[in-house]
Amino acid sequence: MKSAQYSLVLLLGFTLLYLLPLEFRALWQPDETRYAEISREMLSAGNWIVPHFLDVRYFEKPVAGYWINNLSQMIFGHNNFSVRFGAVFSTTLSALMVAWLAFRLWRDKTVAVLSGVIFLTCLLVYGVGTYAVLDPMITLWLVAAMCSFWLGANAQTRAGKAGGYILLGLACGMGVMTKGFLALAVPVLGVLPWVIAQKRWKEVLLFGPLAIISATLITLPWALAIAKAEPTFWHYFFWVEHIQRFAENDAQHKAPFWYYIPFLIAGCLPWVALLPGALKRSWNERHIESGTLYLLGWVVMPLLFFSIAKGKLPTYILPCFAPLAILLARHATQLVATPRTLKVNGWINTVFGAVCALIVLLVLAPWGIAKHPIYASHEVLKVIQASIAFLVWALVGYLTTRNNARLWQWAALCPLGIALLVGGMIPDKVVYSKHPQAFVDLVRPELESSRYILADSVGVGAGIAWEMKRSDITLYAKPGELDYGLTTFADAKDNFVSRDDFASWLALHRKEGNVSLVKLLSKDSVLEDSDVPAPDKVYHKGRFLLFFYEKTP
């Protein structure tokens, strides 16, 4: 295949996987609705220094990730595409840097291109990279740090080394402004094995201060600005968001040490058969190829760091897939002459896709053996779409086994069916619990006529705020992640109404206009709710419930 044709195929595949589906999937709560609304409020208020969420100060993250999302919404407007494009943009830049680093290491265009392709199509990378969270942004800056250090360490002149370390500091500084101080810890841990093995301590001590200075310079303006505007920000962000989340017994999302192992393995689909050999080859070559040791350090050390931390989420290990993709690509190119592993990889994809399709048809479908099927009887079309999505995975996997020496790279298209069909195969049980936009569409006239809107879920409230383009959503009964902002700042007290106070609050405020209370029911809850006054209208769909109170004289 000629270079121009190859480039066209890559561009087409990227468009189908990463760009085309973005608009046609509803936003998920709480994550996507949160980040959509925070950026919308930043743009609306013109305040790019202090994040606000539902008109409440929100200190869980710094601002650089929001800035990327802000720019996306400025360019593309108020739609699902713009909400997710910041993540796609960051993931794409990360893939380009992965390809660049692979080429710098081995001067092999095939390995370089495959590294970027494998990175983009790893299941975890694809899932997070098209989802509106901040992890793709922090991954971007950590990959930039990985590349910058290698650039500086291998420069032949003092100026080149200084430039690499300055870029390293800038990347780390932007990482701090995206998700905090782990952007300093992860690069240090990642390069540590290589620095020790290569005995580069003198160089690091000589040029390292340049990285510290550049990181400080790029971070300082915003750090001072938010400290002046909100003096409590740094105390909360450092102690609560870092110490408690990563070390203390009450850390969020606690999980065992081995938690990330299954996510690392499954996250490598559709390339998972390459993983054992790639890691083994890298370990065996660690003393022969310094670049291999460097990449291995960037995989293992952050993985250990996040495994030791008590708070864990699958998205935290996203940066590990950048060096891992290069190791997988290089290992794969070494296997072409003896492609048994490549054939095994094809069969794994075939079995995975076929088994998932069978689970949909025989277990999850309305006629399936599950006691409570996830699909309802009227969702046959969704069952068909889900089955086709996984059958595409199986079919592509099977095709790669027919001539695996030539076609194994086409495994990159395994996720294509899911990418194109996932928006239409989500069961209503999920839609009407995780997609507030769907419920808003059903009750839009009531919400538009409401002077006050309350929600007992921050994620649902964010979805309503985004859809209605209004940030004055009052939280009811459950402050959730806005608890700090609601309890710390006196000007936020009107943004929350307790269950006990609701009746008196309603009697007073419905004189000013209609009131809507949107609730997210628990899975086992009943429709009746004796805790609130009788509404004039009730709308119920799935786990979403709207109590509508008309204005009183």
From Swiss-Prot:
It is found in: Cell inner membrane. GO terms for molecular function: 4-amino-4-deoxy-L-arabinose transferase activity; mannosyltransferase activity. Keywords: Cell inner membrane, Cell membrane, Glycosyltransferase, Lipid A biosynthesis, Lipid biosynthesis, Lipid metabolism, Lipopolysaccharide biosynthesis, Membrane, Transferase, Transmembrane, Transmembrane helix. One of its GO terms (cellular component) is plasma membrane. The keyword Lipid metabolism applies. The chain crosses the membrane at residues 8-28, 83-103, 111-131, 132-152, 176-196, 204-224, 255-275, 288-308, 317-337, 350-370, 380-400, 407-427. It catalyses: 4-amino-4-deoxy-alpha-L-arabinopyranosyl di-trans,octa-cis-undecaprenyl phosphate + lipid IVA = lipid IIA + di-trans,octa-cis-undecaprenyl phosphate. Disulfide bonds: none annotated. The keyword S-adenosyl-L-methionine does not apply. It is an enzyme of class 2 (transferase). GO terms for biological process: lipid A biosynthetic process; lipopolysaccharide biosynthetic process; protein O-linked glycosylation; response to iron(III) ion. Its EC number is 2.4.2.43. Pfam families: PMT. Pathway: Lipopolysaccharide metabolism; 4-amino-4-deoxy-beta-L-arabinose-lipid A biosynthesis. Coiled coil: none annotated. Signal peptide: none annotated. PANTHER family: MANNOSYLTRANSFERASE YKCB-RELATED, UNDECAPRENYL PHOSPHATE-ALPHA-4-AMINO-4-DEOXY-L-ARABINOSE ARABINOSYL TRANSFERASE. Belongs to the glycosyltransferase 83 family. This is Undecaprenyl phosphate-alpha-4-amino-4-deoxy-L-arabinose arabinosyl transferase. It comes from Enterobacter sp. (strain 638).
